[in-house]
Design a protein with these regions (language model features):
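Extracellular/periplasmic catalytic domains that process cell-envelope and extracellular macromolecules
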Residues: 25-28, 58, 76-80, 95, ...
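Active-site donor-binding loop signature of nucleotide-sugar glycosyltransferases
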Residues: 117, 187, 218
C-alpha cells in the first residue's frame, strides 16, 4: 500500500485494530469489510475473489477493507461498514466475542455477503447458519453444469438467461433455511452426486434478524471470478446487502 493510501486510510477510519484498505478514497460513498480467514481448506481462488471485489468497489464507489484475521471484528470497527463479506472462509473462525459483535451488526440493519465456502464455516453457531442460509455437506468435482434462473425479472438476476451453463464445483447442503429467497438453482438429477433432486438452491437473498444477507455457492474456480454473469451477480448482491442503490 502506498504512503498516500495509508494516510487516506487513517484519516477515514482510525480503527482500533489495523485493517488493510485495498482501494480507499474519500470519494467513495460507503465501506465493506472483506474477511478471508480459513481454519480448514484454503481455496486458491481467494486472491481472484479479492481482486474482483476491489474492482467492483472501484466501479460502484465503495471502499474495500480486507483481513484474513477475524480479530478485526470489533464493535468499534464495524461501526464504519455497511456489510461484511465472507469470501471462501472455512472452519470455526470467530470467537464468542466476535460472534456477538457480528450478531449485533446484523441486528442494527447491516448486511452480510457469503461466497462459496462461507457455508463451510461456523457449524456450531446456528445463528450464522441461518444468516448464510445453509450449511455445506459435500461437493462434486469441477464440472460444467446448467443453472436455472428462478426469476430473471428480479433486479439481481435480470441480466441472466433462464438457463445457462458455467464450470465450477457444486455444493450439496446438509441444512437449508426456510427463510431464503432463491435466485438460482440446479437440477441435481442431471449429475452424479446431486442430493437435492430437481431443487438444489445455488444463490439466494433474505432479510434476517434486522439485516440483509446474500449468498452464492458459486466461487470455487478462479475462472468464475472472471465470468461477466457472475461478476454482475456478485456486484448486485454486495449492493443489496449493503442497502445501497444498484
Amino acid at each position: 500500500m502506498s504512503l498516500a493510501l495509508l494516510f487516506i486510510n487513517f484519516l477515514l477510519f482510525p480503527f482500533d485494530i489495523d485493517i488493510n484498505c485495498l482501494n480507499c478514497s474519500n470519494q467513495n460513498s460507503f465501506s465493506v469489510l472483506l474477511i478471508t480467514e480459513t481454519k480448514d481448506w484454503v481455496h486458491d481462488s481467494i486472491e481472484s475473489g479479492i481482486d474482483l471485489i476491489v474492482d467492483i468497489g472501484d466501479k460502484k464507489n465503495f471502499n474495500v477493507y480486507h483481513s484474513d484475521d477475524s480479530k478485526v471484528i470489533t464493535t468499534e470497527n464495524l461501526k464504519e461498514f455497511n456489510s461484511i463479506i465472507f469470501l471462501n472462509t472455512t472452519g470455526d473462525i470467530l470467537n464468542n466475542y466476535e460472534q456477538k459483535v457480528m450478531e449485533n451488526f446484523i441486528k442494527n440493519g447491516k448486511g452480510f455477503v457469503g461466497v462459496h465456502a462461507a457455508s463451510d464455516t461456523e457449524y456450531e453457531w446456528q445463528w450464522y447458519g441461518d444468516l448464510v442460509g445453509a450449511y455445506f455437506m459435500n461437493h462434486s468435482g469441477i464440472v460444467d453444469r446448467k443453472i436455472f434462473t428462478v426469476d430473471n425479472t428480479h433486479i439481481m438476476t435480470e441480466h441472466l438467461n433462464p438457463e445457462w451453463n458455467i464450470v465450477d464445483e457444486w455444493y450439496n447442503f446438509k441444512y437449508i433455511s426456510d427463510n431464503i429467497n432463491v435466485l438460482l438453482k440446479l437440477d441435481d438429477a442431471s449429475y452424479d452426486g446431486g442430493e437435492h433432486p430437481h431443487n438444489q438452491p445455488l444463490t439466494w437473498y433474505q432479510e434476517y434478524d434486522g439485516g440483509r444477507s446474500f449468498y452464492t455457492a458459486l466461487g470455487h474456480a478462479k475462472e468464475v471470478f472472471k465470468d461477466e454473469r457472475f461478476i454482475e451477480l456478485l456486484e448486485k448482491g454486495i449492493l443489496y446487502a449493503s442497502n445501497e442503490d444498484y
